[in-house]
Amino acid sequence: MNATPAIVMPSTDEEIWRYSRIAERFDDQQQRLDGLRRFFSFSNEITPREFDGYARPLLQRTLAYAWAPRVEAAQRADFEQRTSAWLGQGYVIRDQDAQGNWQPAPLRDHYFPVLYTQSADQPALPYGLDLAGQGARQATLARALEPGSMAVSEPLQIMDAEAGRPAAQAGGLLMVAPVFAERGPDNAPSGYVMALLSMRQLIAALYEDIIKPRLAGVPASARCWSGK
């Protein structure tokens, strides 16, 4: 038994308009993230307060924003020490496994740890999380290496950083954009800004704008579901 809704492409002007609204919402996310990228690109140094002040107004329809600078292996100890003093709390570049357990990141040539993060509520992107050590996230970074580029991850499970279990917003997409304020080795990005998007919110928008209007006035017994 296959109980998936039949997918029908837009065929009327009204349906095309509704699909365009979904595209516009995604374009809006890209524009907001690009604004955050430019904020970093044209600033010499950004404080946690400045990041929070810029990112917080952008949080509508976005779970979190974050900044992850590139840290070379030789810089790690000094970076962790300075960041702990700067943030006023212990800071370690770290990895999280599939069960939500944390451990210090092993030696790597370089790291992209979350340094600043801003969210309206949990889940946020945890401080110190090394994107270079997270398979799907690292693959996303690898697709955004050129100035002006962006990449979106495959659907990810979002972990509650404090509880060590899947968060209420269990599914999400990570949109990343490279920053080239200072060219790294081999012209690599100096860091990434990122937005964490809720799959639940995206699906809700799809339902409200596309599916619900199609079902309006259609008897339940006549609604289009494939069943073989």
Annotated model-derived regions:
Residues 4-33, 40-48:
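Membrane-proximal amphipathic alpha-helices
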